[in-house]
């Protein structure tokens, strides 16, 4: 029997991976070829999707992108056999731009440093046995009986910062919740991934859900919480099914419920589907939504670590952060020497340790997921994602999501350091690691107005700077674009942005200055002509 791997990731399905899987299965039945069709997550290099992999005694081979018209040729070339070794007649395939080879030689993967995405695309997402065989649960089994202070100290040593956008040190949140004198504490995983150009949370939830669940359980055991929640974006239908099934498997395996792994410690995880509002990705608005209230931002202090869900101490981290927890705390040699912790701390930059899961989309040849060390330059990342034959065809990149800054594509910004401190120095944010590349067909005036319209629509309305400021900036911007009192209106726009940055209750208002100021600074000639 030949193992045949095809992704059922949401993005892969949108590229007809499901239809290709059905056609291959039917053709195998017709030819009486015994194949084992295995659905996986996606490697995240979407120009190759639908990607078909076969595994035999010679290894794993990939072919993609496969179209319906290629299916018969694949079978005629005996791809689905034990003797296939990667050599076959490519005459019919090269015309369609099909690539093939051993998965170990897949260059877009080989050059990455995949720590938390190492299983995505390789193993069936809901196979707990495969997860365990690949090192999963080693972190949980190790820390379940360790002193909580030691666990938090190891997270501190690793240098892990939250991957939700703000980059706040993870250990501080956990330590604060641990020290709070409360019988009831909560763990919340923020899976309300709403930024444009961000899709890593969804991909790992669909492709390796056990790594997230393990990280959440570790957090609960460490700080003394009994209940955890995954707050999932309402549009993530496939991820919802995957998470619910994974939670059932964990319950049946004794990883959730009473006496986890016979330790005497209890912890449960529930899934909550979000209300669909962009601002619910902000941690306090998310908590309000979880309490069946309107998703509006809370005043701080107190922070959620002191008064969070139902006013109880709450650890609130995003999906990728919990995945890094599972990685960092596993593979120990003894209590004080952790191979993964040491490696994580050794890569990246001084203030941005480890890897970042960059999500590259737009005008690139190979859009997708690139898990690379913090501090990689923009040029290195763009080259890895396919490169460009003509730099002049590119106009801009936006880094950090909808509220991230726009940068021109030139020699100065090709050397941009992709880290928290590197983006800060250039007046930008790293955010969730989303990078959208624009060519010269993009209308940046339209992008500016669309950003302002989005902020107006998505403001929760609680604070005046955001509610009124975004509307006022749009009015003034429209005047500027009509060449009405340009200097005076630009000055007022700057004053309002400064007010919003200092007085808004959340990032929706406080970070609006990043896209607006960067567009006006770096693309002034286009915006004002």
Model region roles, listed by residue range:
Residues 3, 17-39, 56-81, 138-155, ...:
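Ferredoxin-type iron-sulfur electron-transfer modules in oxidoreductases and energy-metabolism complexes
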Residues 12-13, 47, 136, 155-177, ...:
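Conserved phosphate/anionic-ligand binding catalytic regions in large, soluble enzymes, centered on
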Residues 16-18, 48-53, 166-174, 198-201, ...:
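Short acidic, glycine/serine/threonine-rich loops at helix termini
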Residues 59-157, 285, 295-310, 441, ...:
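Fe-S ferredoxin-like electron-transfer domains
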Residues 112, 240-374, 386:
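Hydrophobic alpha-helical positions that pack around
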Residues 141-181, 341-346, 351, 359, ...:
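Accessory "access/gating" subregions that flank catalytic or transport cores
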Residues 208-222:
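Histidine-anchored nucleotide/phosphate-binding helix
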Residues 215-219, 373-391:
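Short amphipathic, charge-patterned alpha-helical segments
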């Amino acid at each position: 029997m030949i193992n045949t791997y095809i992704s059922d990731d949401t993005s892969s399905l949108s590229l007809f991976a499901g239809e290709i899987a059905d056609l291959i299965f039917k053709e195998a039945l017709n030819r009486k070829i015994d194949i084992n069709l295995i659905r996986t997550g996606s490697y995240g290099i979407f120009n190759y999707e639908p990607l078909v992999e076969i595994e035999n005694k010679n290894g794993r081979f990939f072919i993609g992108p496969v179209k319906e018209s290629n299916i018969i040729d694949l079978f005629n070339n005996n791809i689905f056999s034990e003797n296939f070794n990667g050599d076959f007649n490519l005459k019919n395939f090269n015309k369609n731009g099909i690539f093939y080879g051993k998965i170990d030689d897949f260059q877009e993967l080989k050059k990455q440093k995949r720590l938390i995405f190492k299983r995505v695309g390789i193993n069936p997402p809901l196979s707990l046995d495969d997860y365990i065989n690949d090192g999963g649960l080693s972190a949980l089994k190790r820390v379940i009986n360790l002193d909580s202070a030691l666990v938090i100290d190891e997270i501190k040593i690793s240098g892990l910062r939250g991957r939700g956008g703000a980059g706040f040190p993870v250990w501080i949140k956990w330590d604060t919740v641990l020290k709070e004198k409360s019988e009831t504490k909560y763990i919340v995983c923020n899976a309300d991934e709403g930024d444009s150009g961000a899709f890593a949370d969804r991909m790992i939830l669909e492709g390796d859900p056990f790594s997230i669940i393990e990280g959440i359980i570790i957090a609960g055991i460490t700080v003394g919480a009994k209940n955890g929640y995954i707050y999932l974006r309402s549009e993530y239908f496939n991820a919802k099914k995957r998470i619910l099934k994974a939670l059932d498997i964990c319950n049946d395996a004794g990883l959730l419920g009473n006496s986890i792994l016979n330790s005497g410690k209890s912890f449960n995880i529930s899934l909550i589907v979000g209300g669909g509002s962009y601002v619910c990705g902000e941690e306090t608005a998310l908590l309000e939504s979880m309490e069946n209230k309107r998703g509006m931002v809370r005043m701080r202090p107190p922070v959620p670590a002191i008064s969070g869900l139902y006013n109880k101490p709450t650890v609130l981290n995003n999906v990728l952060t919990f995945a890094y927890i599972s990685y960092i705390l596993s593979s120990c040699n003894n209590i004080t020497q952790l191979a993964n912790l040491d490696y994580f701390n050794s890569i990246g930059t001084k203030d941005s340790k480890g890897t970042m899961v960059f999500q590259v989309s737009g005008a690139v040849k190979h859009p997708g997921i690139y898990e690379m060390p913090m501090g990689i330059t923009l040029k290195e990342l763009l080259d890895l994602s396919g490169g460009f034959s003509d730099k002049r065809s590119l106009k801009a990149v936006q880094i950090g999501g909808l509220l991230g800054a726009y940068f021109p594509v030139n020699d100065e910004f090709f050397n941009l350091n992709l880290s928290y401190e590197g983006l800060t120095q250039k007046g930008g944010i790293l955010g969730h690691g989303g990078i959208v590349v624009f060519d010269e067909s993009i209308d940046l005036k339209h992008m500016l107005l669309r950003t302002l319209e989005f902020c107006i629509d998505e403001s929760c309305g609680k604070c005046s700077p955001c509610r009124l400021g975004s509307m006022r900036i749009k009015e003034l911007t429209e005047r500027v674009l009509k060449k009405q009192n340009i200097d005076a209106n630009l000055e007022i726009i700057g004053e309002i942005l400064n007010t919003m940055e200092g007085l808004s209750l959340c990032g929706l208002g406080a970070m609006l200055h990043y896209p607006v100021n960067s567009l006006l600074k770096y693309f002034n000639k286009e915006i004002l002509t």
